[in-house]
Amino acid sequence: MVTGGIAPNTEGGVFPGAAGLFDADDVANHKIVTDRVHGSDGKIAMQILHAGRYAYGPNCVAPSPIKSPISPFVPAELDAVGIEKQIDDIVTTACRARDAGYDGVEIMGSEGYFINQFLVLHTNKRTDQWGWLL
């Protein structure tokens, strides 16, 4: 079993209040789910999903400030420190998933979400080490 997308931080959530794994309280809540699955001899992985420009909220962030067709919000362009923070938050979320008892993680890197936004020229207009336009 694989969960639906779990946000690594508030700015990466699909919408404000979206499911996340941000702190020890969230770990405890997720452990309730993983314990139930394991109690039935099942396995469960957690999908980490950072929505990037697809987030439906005013605090969304992305490689470049290009509005998505599915959200009215223009994302804030991340600087290098902000990009590193997003990476660190994804790693921290994977570690919290382990602590919550998940058997694995899947990091969503396709379908136009955050990681994919770095890989596509249309959504990445950067000229630094994180961009296509070097």
Regions of interest found by a model, annotated:
Residues 1-134:
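Flavin-dependent oxidoreductase catalytic cores
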